Amino acid sequence: AARVKPKLDEIKAKAEEAQQQARLQALWAYGNEPVKGGAQISAAIYSQEPVDTDGGGSHPVRLIFRDHPDWGRSSYLVLEAGDFDCYGGCRLKVIADGKTHTLPGSRPKTDDAIAMFVEDHKRLWKLAKESKQLSIEFPTKAVGKKTAEFEVGGLEPDKLPKWN
């Protein structure tokens, strides 16, 4: 039994690691929709915990990476309630595995969705690809600065080939 235990522990650890990686991969949703001029492909993930973005209760925040034939590549956050306070542009504090970065953000003047672009989409993609944990602090109109945390370790970069 003493001889078998180390090998058994190693097998258990590998199984737990594989299970954790599968859980992290399942957090991401990938889209591939036909649009005029080609296909829009995307990778999206919800925040680990809901965030109160309007003073009326907590809701998930979504981080999306999109590749569109007409609009190109973009990364943005989407709220279910409240609004971003970033119409003239803003600076976002992004923490990737404990290391702080500052990226530019902007809120488009549209009512289609409550979205805010992370303007340096290439850098955010690189951080998401290389990190396990990503948090983004963003300004809201109603309740000031809020932070959404994402478990990004399961991102499958090959699903958005033009981003790599």
Task: Indicate where each model-derived feature is located.
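A generic "folded-domain core" signal
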Residues: 2-164
